């Protein structure tokens, strides 16, 4: 007869990382598979106690005094006490002596000491950051970054520094300057530098880039993107949310991630464009000014940048007026304008164009009337005449 089935097998629990546990728990944490995984990934600062504290717990469990341990290990009582207090390191030699006298592997003590020294080194670096870099941290719109989930209101200044560097994926401030500050500054047009907050703009751009990494797309095809661009103007007829979803979907098919991120305080960007990898472009829009026609012109403007200026590391537009000295913006505006309103229709837009005629032209092109009204308002520098045709931008993200 078969033996009756035993009790159901229980899953092995994860190590309990309670600083109050005795050394057995620490051994399990270090030598178990779970503990090894934690060690590979790194652990919170208080995950393991200093070696001296664990040693004292071991002595207490065995009812051994420090003096007895000193005698058994042939070390001075003073040195044992210093190790217990954490004022002296637990050396490799002492670890071997503890292995012989207590039976605990020397590798256990060595790993404890290595982890402890690593933690102390991290704390020293954290303190140096806090002392030297608080001024850099405070240049950013902290509350807005808390609201966006980049930082936490519960973070200390040191933790905020670490989180912000990790957010930008850089190791230190010099790396931030090379990777973010210099490209962003170069991305502004000459006339915009006085109005630009480079720190808020860099954070806004990074938010968009982070979203773009999560957007699945085909490899970038500049020719296909340029070919499809005029057809995208039909999306202006849809609701904002439907249009943006379709825009993202169609652009992803040719390797362009289109992202939306409200501007941060101090960031006055309408849009930005960059190649985040050789096979993936990014168009980032902020919805600044909150008008439907401005949003769509901003998209076509940034799309034109990707097509016309693919070698520039990043391009940030605070406005879309074409005020630069080298003519790049004028060329970009002209390209975007033709894609949105073909030249044969643009030639019909004059000061004598009525709101009714503007609507007829929009229908002929296949765009929302506000797109034509926005162009007329810009050309005439009169933002009231066609205001009833222009509408506000609604929420475009779920």
Predicted feature descriptions by range:
Residues 2-9, 15-398:
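Active-site hotspot residues in diverse enzymes, especially metal/ion-binding acidic/histidine motifs
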